[in-house]
């Protein structure tokens, strides 16, 4: 550094430094970050999280149904903590009890801020599929995943991520009458979606929250994915019991989900066991982690 100063002179160096700083300030003033999308990065600025959480609180607490959702978010650890922790890694093992149904078992890392995900087979680490936020892809042979990976990419998040996944745009909330479940009074909120929201906007969820703690106890839902129901319609409603909640870096998440057919608003025949394990928030990932890898096939 001393040698450099001797070469160019102290005055010239100071002029250059000041000019660079002024140019940097000018450039920074002209660049306004998008507060909702981070391209090719897993790190979310704290100010963006604060802004998104503030807007979510204002929107949700403006209605009685939204207030229940907000209170549940707080009870489960808070929307800010959910986003601050970064992408969530977990093994999601979906095990139908019916013999003709396909098990879906993968380790995934999902980015709830941008709805991006990468799944890896639990038996072949080279077999992967995912969603970039825009493109669904797969990199595996034809036998690795015997199910619709495009449909399944973000499905686990929407089965286990309530109430946090209700913060987005296009979400409609309706407060239904209280109901009794497992001898407890529950607050009940129905979630629907605007047309054009996601691949299956006709889906709905009916969420049962403990009226005292606001922790999620059960989820009723339908599947209306157009590739499965080309003429419209949906499957019969399912009733999903929420099992033990575990603390993952300050966020309470389910380790077990038990799915039944719904009968008169309550659980009927038990049809699917879902075990969620190895949950951890992953703070350090390559910037291109959620991009479609070389050699992958676009779905």
Give, region by region, the residue ranges found by the protein language model.
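N-terminal mature ectodomain segment of secretory-pathway/periplasmic proteins
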Residues: 34-37, 51-144, 172-180
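Flexible, processing/modification-adjacent segments and terminal tails
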Residues: 61-65, 130-203, 227-233, 285, ...
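Extracytoplasmic
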Residues: 85-87, 168, 184, 252
């Amino acid at each position: 550094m001393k040698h450099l100063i001797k070469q160019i002179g102290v005055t010239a160096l100071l002029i250059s430094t000041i000019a660079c700083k002024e140019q940097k300030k000018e450039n920074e003033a002209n660049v306004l970050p998008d507060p909702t999308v981070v391209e090719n990065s897993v790190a979310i600025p704290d100010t963006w999280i604060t802004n998104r959480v503030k807007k979510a609180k204002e929107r949700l607490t403006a209605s009685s149904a939204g207030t229940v959702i907000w209170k549940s978010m707080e009870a489960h650890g808070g929307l800010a903590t959910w986003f601050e922790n970064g992408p969530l890694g977990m093994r999601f093992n979906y095990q139908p009890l019916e013999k003709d149904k396909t098990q879906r078992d993968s380790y995934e890392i999902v980015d709830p801020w941008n709805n991006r995900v990468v799944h890896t087979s639990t038996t072949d680490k080279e077999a992967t599929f995912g969603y970039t936020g825009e493109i669904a892809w797969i990199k595996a042979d034809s036998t690795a995943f015997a199910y619709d990976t495009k449909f399944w990419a973000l499905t686990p998040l929407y089965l286990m991520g309530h109430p946090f996944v209700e913060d987005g745009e296009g979400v409609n909330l309706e407060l239904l009458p209280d109901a009794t479940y497992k001898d407890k009074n529950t607050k009940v909120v129905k979630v629907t979606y605007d047309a054009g929201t996601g691949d299956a906007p006709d889906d709905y969820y009916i969420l049962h929250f403990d009226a005292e703690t606001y922790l999620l106890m059960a989820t009723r839902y339908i599947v209306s994915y157009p590739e499965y129901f080309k003429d419209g319609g949906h499957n019969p409603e399912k009733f999903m019991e929420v099992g033990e909640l575990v603390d993952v870096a300050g966020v309470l998440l389910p380790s077990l989900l038990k799915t039944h057919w719904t009968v008169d608003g309550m659980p009927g025949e038990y049809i699917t066991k879902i075990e969620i394990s190895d949950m951890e928030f992953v703070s350090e990932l390559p910037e291109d982690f959620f991009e479609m890898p070389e050699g992958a096939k676009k779905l």
